[in-house]
């Protein structure tokens, strides 16, 4: 709302409805997928580092099984949660085809410890991106943008800078998984 009545930098045009479009693109098309994939990569890394007990790595298939086991009546909130969470997990899995192939190979190989160590060595440098693409950096940039009354900076930062980090992180992680799959 704050951006709505402000002028677009270096022009005499007000943001108006453009502010809603800009913020919607930043939030729905950039922030949401970036955060979900960053979370997924972090959970994958923790899974390979600490095992199932040290990670919250969930699968679409497991969430659907839980959903199907719930009673049809009297479990509205549970069904709503697991339905949405299953979709969330499915979106993560669909965006990581190389990891899915690698993970199936690793599971089928009696959980090869050398392969696990190689994965962790390749995944560790990408963890800085998972941390940057979650809350802290966003909060700092949003805070600075609001304090300086240059709120347009935040959605553009989200769309340009954070998306570039996301693309790099995603590409590198998938390449790592493809190398290890061979």
Feature names for model-found ranges:
Residues 1-34:
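Multi-pass membrane catalytic core of lipid/isoprenoid biosynthesis enzymes
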Residues 30-182:
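C-terminal membrane-associated helical module and adjoining short loops/tails
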């Amino acid at each position: 709302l704050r951006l709505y009545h402000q002028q677009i930098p270096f022009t005499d045009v007000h943001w108006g409805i453009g502010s809603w479009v800009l913020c919607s693109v930043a939030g729905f098309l950039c922030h949401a997928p970036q955060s979900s994939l960053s979370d997924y990569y972090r959970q994958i890394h923790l899974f390979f580092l600490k095992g199932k007990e040290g990670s919250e790595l969930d699968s679409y298939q497991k969430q659907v099984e839980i959903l199907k086991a719930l009673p049809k009546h009297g479990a509205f909130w549970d069904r709503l949660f697991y339905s949405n969470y299953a979709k969330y997990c499915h979106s993560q899995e669909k965006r990581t085809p190389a990891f899915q192939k690698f993970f199936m190979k690793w599971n089928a190989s009696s959980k090869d410890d050398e392969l696990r160590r190689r994965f962790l060595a390749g995944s560790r440098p990408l963890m800085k991106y998972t941390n940057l693409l979650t809350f802290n950096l966003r909060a700092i940039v949003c805070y600075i943008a609001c304090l300086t009354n240059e709120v347009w900076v935040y959605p553009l930062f989200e769309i340009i800078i954070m998306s570039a980090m996301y693309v790099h992180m995603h590409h590198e992680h998938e390449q790592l998984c493809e190398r290890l799959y061979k």
